[in-house]
């Protein structure tokens, strides 16, 4: 279909039942890593300490932190603080403060299968502006999930998210989005 300008995935995006179960196992560990971060994250800690938690917990449970050394990325997790959109690099000199919001983006390889998720944390007393962006972002995620239907269009997901973001005074960074998971870190489809 290249003559019509359609984009054909470079590899099969459909998974077998066995592959889906392996992806779910990886995702369960990925969620457990985020839960471990939630137990320890606090005002006064560095983002490098978050990286240490992610690395140690992942390795202790048989996984591999997918970001570590991926295309030169130097850490095991992405920590995006306040206005940083994504893929922030943990650093011992970045100390969490009262009022910060931080997105912790964890990606795990378990038995050769990749999973990827992030969680937003609010530290101490955050501003009304920060509360709003966290709330609207969560609403956007939920609307996107509600728009995801078997044999539906990916554009419906993007439309639901983009519409709600714009209605609340925000925009969506078009160069960054969701992606498939499984046998590779970033698989089709790109959402």
What do these predicted ranges mean?
Residues 1-191:
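Active-site neighborhoods and metal-handling regions in enzymes and metal-associated proteins
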